[in-house]
Every structure is written in C-alpha cells, then in structure tokens.
C-alpha cells in the first residue's frame, strides 16, 4: 500500500476557519482584502486572518509577534462583546502584499503561547467560502497528524485554500479534518491520489465534503443490512428470531436484547448478508402479528437518525393537520376549572357537528383553562366565533379564536410589528402637578415610568387615580389623600354658572410626612393568582399603591367589580381600567419592561386581557412572548439612521402590541 510522503518544504497558502465542519477561508468586515497564492484579490491594505490563537494572546502581543517580520499597520484580537474574552482568532493588517506574504511564510504554523497558529489571507467573499467547491473530508487520521502535516500531505495535488484538523476542547485530534482546494479539479486529483493511502501508518479516507443535511439525505437512500424489530413477545428467543427472518435470506446474526437479569426487552436486531434480503424481510414482516403482538420491522437507525425522522414526521403531520383543519379548529380559553371534555362538547354542540373536542390539562390532571373544538364545516366554526367569543360561561367571558400554531402566531406578530409606524411621544411639559378636569375618572393613564407623584385627589367612579401626561415631572412630592366623596380642589379658580372663571385663593394643603408615605411597591398579587376583593382599609386616608420607579396606581379590583366598571365605561376608560389591574401583575413578572409589556398586552381583545388577569400561567406566557418580540424588534431598529429620531428603539417599542387579531 502506498505511503504518503509529505514534502519537506512548501509555500502554503495556509488554512482557515472550519465552517459547518468544512475548512473555509476567513473574512472580516471592514478590513481591506488581501491576496496571494490562494487567488484572493489584493488591495492596498493586505489583511491576514490568524486562527487558533491562545485565549490569553493580547493585541499588543500579536502586534509584537508579527512586527518581528515586517512593520504592521494594525492588529485586532476578536473578543466576545459581552464578556470581552478572546474568540481565538484575530486579524493583522500590512501595508502591502509582500510584507503579508513574508509573514505567512515565516509565521504560519508557528507557535504562539505554546499553541500552533494558522494564517491565511482574509477574504470578504463569503460565497466562495460557503460554496463547498473543492472541499474534501479526510478521516482516519493518526493522532499525530496536525494542520501542518495535513497541509504538506495534500500540497502536491494543487493550490490549497484552507486546511484544518478537527480537535476537541483539549486540543487533541478527533481523527478527521478538511482540505479545500481552489478548484474542483485539484480536489478530484487529491481524491484519486490520496484516497486509501497511508499517512503516518494509518490508511486514510479522502472524499468530497458533504454537509450534515446532505449526509443524512444520502444515508436514507443507502441500502441497509441491519434490521430492527420491536414489540416481541417476552418468550421470543434468538433462535426463533433467526428462524423467522431466515426465510428471506442468509443471516449473519440475530439477537433479542435483554436487561441485566436476562429478561427480554422485547426488541432485537437481525443482520442480513445482503441488503436485498433485508429489504424483503422488512416489507413482509412489518405489521405482522406473532403471539398476538404486532411486530414493527424496519431499518436499524442511529439515535440521531431516529430523532431526525421523528422531527420530520411531526413537522409534516403538523403541516398537514394545519391545512386539513384550516378554518375548522377553534381555540377556547378562560374556561372554568370544572369544565370537562363532555361539558365543552355540550357547550358548542348546538352550532354543528363537532369532530374533536378537548380540554387541555397539566400532568396532574388539572385543567389549564383552555381547550380546542373542531367542527366539520367552516360555516359552523364561523358561527361560534360570532356568537361565543366574549360570552359569559360560569362567570367568565370566553375567548374563542381560530387555532394557530405557535410558529404561525409568531410570524404574524413579527410581520405586524415590522409594518407598524413608531408612535410619537409628546415632549416634556411644565414641571407642575396636573389635575384631570371634567367628570370623575376620565383621566388617561399612561404606563410609562415617571417620577414621584404630585398631589392626587381621589375621585370616585371607576377606581383609579388620574395620572401625569407622559414626559412631565411633578414640582414637589407628597400631598394629602382625599377621602371618597370629598371634593378635590380645582387648580387656580372655579367657574360660576356660565360666567368666566374667577380666581380664588386656596388654602395650602399640608404635606405628608415621610413616614406617612407608602414604601416600595404597595400593590399585592392576589392569592392564587385570582383577583379577589380587597379587605377594608383602616383610617381616613385613601391608600395609593406607589412604586418609586413608576407611576402611582390603585389597588386592583376584584373580577366582579372590574366587570361592572367595564360594562359602564367608554372604550378609552375600559383600557385604563384594564391597565390598572394588569400593570401590577406584569410588574411582578418583569419590572424592567413592565410599562412596554403592559401597553402591548392592552392591544389584545378585552376578553383575553380579562383571562390574563385570572390566569397567572397565561399571563406569564404572554409576558414571555412580548419580551421576545421586544428583543427581536429592538435589533433591526438600532440599525436606522441616527438622525431619524422617530425610528429610535424607544419609539418603536412604544408602538408595539401583541394583538393576534389586528
């Protein structure tokens, strides 16, 4: 067998980074393109990629190391933005290609901090690196083969663009590597010359590189000889298995798998001598009954292959199921805990033929308060949407909508938010307390973080305190809390009949002492996650829940009180009432973005918001979904022009919602 002889000298266009398991040239944005024997076009500034750096190598150390050869223009060790730790690679810029070539020839595969480094010309053309043209996979390498040895072994077959031996976290060879040539012809030449040859006393395999998806697809099409059989009777023996499968061809082995005590695990493997016999046995025996048990017989697969196949089947089934039930399957939530599958079916039976009906439950069997109902016709489902959404059942308003997969909902939300224009936020107003005029309870509550509260006279009506206009700050802190029914002062004067406002001097109101002011977050999360009536508050002062970081807000009302108030309120007032009850609950889950998340949740249907107030689990899920959307939208918004203030992240986030029905 031929022995591969590595040349004693070489002029290497050196290796680069492994991408998806393949050795590829490296690139860096914003750095001039270099060139050399690898065919990379040279620019005025020649940039070298330096890989496999020790994590302790600094910019200054890299600069000094490369300056020993030629004068360096600049260097950069790439680091993690969050932790500032080295990523194990960097870039060195020279003023001309001659200096860069000298550095490559002298320093490539040299040791820095006890670790061999790799150098290649930096290329910004990612298409060439990712195409896979000329890329080879080499396996069965001896542990002593490193990047330099592999490069020397293949350098006689053509111009090498990159070369890499895969290593573990300890730096030890994994026994395989990748070599990429500049042309496909050079790669084919290497396969013909080196495949099956011996390198460092081991026969190596050289073949075209295939990505994981391509390898798995090719494996599915390959013939097989090993057969997996399950659902065996506990009494089935190896000999019986061999006799049954032996009818279809020659068998090299047959075994029933057993545990440590020798008890059958009810599955086994049969290995045929040729794939045609194995395929015939699978076709004949799969699904056949033995000892009143139906056998499953199929190709023996690795765990990764089984998981991939199951994933494909699930995705295909979900896709087919989604198409099959489009417009027929309804999602119902805010169900009472006592509702069973039968009760849910009875509730919707009057609208048409129900093909399936299920209440979702946790592992302990407790209802999750939601379920699914599928009808035989789209017209029946449409009737349910029109008549049952918002209907009170068991003291709760039902939420009914067309069922959607999670991926579809998320895609819909992302598409919606990307088209929404940023909301305009008013500028900063005068530094003075603002009172809401007109009827009690007509103030607009805006859920944005503000400073300490001004004087806030309590107003009867819908159980909330008027708030500041966004951007305003109070001129002072503290003030008396008026009792219910007590008339609050008007700012600066009063109107007599239809005449003009007359100025009146008002008595200054005493400030509250610091020890009288509420401390920390004054609201409470109702017991069990449900909105329960609050107990009476002692004293003549009206307590105001107050957060040192946000606007003041009132204690959440019970479900009954809230439903009554909503029934008598205008749409604008309904939003404020829901916001007052929702904000404290959101703040306990995510205090940093509570204002933005609350605003997003308020864009949903009223029945769904009421469900969130009743169900901590549903609220947690929606808050998590809202936070994901905030993060995703914040990333593209940061790329906008600095001069376009309306496109700033804060403006974009202020305009978001997670209403599935917009």
UniProtKB/Swiss-Prot annotation:
Record organism: Arabidopsis thaliana (Mouse-ear cress)
Molecular function per GO: mRNA binding
Induction summary: By potyvirus TuMV infection.
Family, as annotated: Belongs to the polyadenylate-binding protein type-1 family.
The organism's place on the tree of life at top rank: Eukaryota
Protein name: Polyadenylate-binding protein 4
Stretches for region Disordered: 1-23, 480-518, 634-662
Gene3D superfamilies: 3.30.70.330, c-terminal domain of poly(a) binding protein
Lineage, highest ranks first: Eukaryota, Viridiplantae, Streptophyta, Embryophyta, Tracheophyta
Domain PABC: 558-635
Oligomeric form and interacting partners: Interacts with ERD15/CID1. Interacts with Turnip mosaic virus (TuMV) VPg-Pro.
Keywords assigned by UniProt, alphabetized: Cytoplasm, Host-virus interaction, Nucleus, Repeat, RNA-binding, Translation regulation
Primary location recorded for the protein, binned into one broad class: cytoplasm
Name of the gene: PAB4
Pfam family, one: RRM_1
């Amino acid at each position: 067998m031929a022995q591969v002889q590595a040349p004693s000298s070489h002029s290497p266009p050196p290796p680069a980074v492994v991408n998806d398991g393949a050795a590829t040239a490296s690139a860096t944005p914003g750095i001039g393109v270099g060139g050399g024997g690898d065919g990379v076009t040279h620019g005025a500034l020649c940039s070298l990629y330096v890989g496999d750096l020790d994590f302790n190598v600094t910019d200054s150390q890299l600069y000094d190391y490369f300056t020993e050869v030629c004068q360096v223009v600049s260097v950069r060790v790439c680091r993690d933005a969050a932790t500032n730790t080295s990523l194990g690679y960097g870039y060195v810029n020279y003023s001309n290609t001659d200096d860069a070539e000298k550095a490559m020839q002298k320093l490539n595969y040299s040791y820095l901090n006890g670790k061999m480094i790799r150098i290649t010309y930096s290329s910004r053309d990612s298409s060439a690196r990712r195409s896979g043209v000329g890329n080879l996979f080499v396996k069965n390498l001896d542990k002593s083969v490193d990047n330099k040895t592999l490069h020397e072994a293949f350098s006689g077959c053509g111009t090498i663009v990159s070369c890499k031996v895969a290593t573990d976290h300890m730096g030890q060879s994994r026994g395989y590597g990748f070599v990429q040539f500049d042309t496909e012809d050079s790669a084919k030449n290497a396969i013909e010359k080196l495949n099956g040859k011996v390198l460092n006393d081991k026969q190596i395999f050289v073949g075209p590189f295939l990505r994981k998806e391509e390898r798995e697809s090719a494996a599915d099409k390959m013939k097989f000889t090993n057969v997996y059989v399950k659902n065996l009777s506990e009494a089935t023996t190896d000999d019986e298995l061999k006799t049954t499968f032996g009818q279809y061809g020659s068998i090299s082995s047959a075994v029933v798998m057993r545990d440590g005590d020798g008890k059958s695990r009810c599955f086994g493997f049969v290995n045929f001598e040729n794939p045609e016999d194995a395929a015939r046995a699978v076709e004949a025996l799969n699904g056949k009954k033995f000892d009143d048990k139906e056998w499953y017989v199929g190709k023996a697969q690795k765990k990764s292959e089984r998981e991939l196949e199951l994933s494909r089947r699930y995705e295909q089934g979900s896709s087919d199921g989604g198409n099959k039930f489009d417009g027929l399957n309804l999602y119902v939530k805010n169900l009472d805990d006592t509702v069973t599958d039968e009760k849910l079916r009875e509730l919707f039976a009057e609208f048409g033929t129900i093909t399936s009906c299920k209440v979702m439950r946790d592992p302990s069997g407790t209802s999750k308060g939601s379920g699914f109902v599928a009808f035989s016709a789209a017209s029946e489902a449409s009737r349910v949407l029109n008549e049952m959404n918002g209907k009170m059942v068991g003291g709760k308003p039902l939420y009914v909508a067309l069922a959607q997969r999670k991926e579809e909902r998320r895609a819909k939300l992302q598409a919606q938010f990307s088209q929404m224009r940023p909301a305009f936020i008013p500028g900063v107003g005068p530094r003075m307390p603002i009172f809401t005029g007109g009827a009690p309870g007509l103030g607009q509550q805006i859920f944005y973080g503000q400073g300490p509260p001004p004087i806030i006279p309590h107003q009867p009506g819908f159980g909330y305190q008027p708030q500041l206009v966004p951007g305003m700050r109070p001129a002072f802190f503290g003030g008396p809390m008026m009792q219910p029914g007590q008339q609050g002062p008007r700012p600066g004067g009063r109107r007599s009949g239809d005449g003009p406002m007359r100025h009146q001097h008002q008595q200054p109101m005493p400030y509250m002492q610091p020890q009288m002011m509420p401390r920390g977050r004054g609201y409470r999360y109702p017991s069990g996650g449900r909105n329960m009536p609050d107990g009476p508050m002692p004293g003549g002062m009206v307590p105001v829940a107050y957060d040192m970081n946000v606007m003041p807000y009132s204690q959440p009302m019970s479900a009954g009180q809230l439903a009554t108030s909503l029934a008598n309120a205008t749409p604008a007032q309904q939003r404020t009432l829901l916001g007052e009850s929702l904000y404290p609950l959101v703040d306990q889950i995510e205090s940093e973005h509570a204002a933005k998340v609350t605003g997003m949740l308020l864009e949903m249907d009223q029945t769904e918001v009421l469900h969130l107030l009743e169900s901590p689990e549903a609220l947690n899920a929606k808050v998590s979904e809202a936070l994901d959307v905030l993060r995703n939208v914040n990333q593209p918004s940061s790329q906008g022009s600095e001069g376009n203030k309306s496109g700033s992240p804060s403006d974009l986030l202020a305009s978001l919602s997670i209403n599935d029905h917009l």
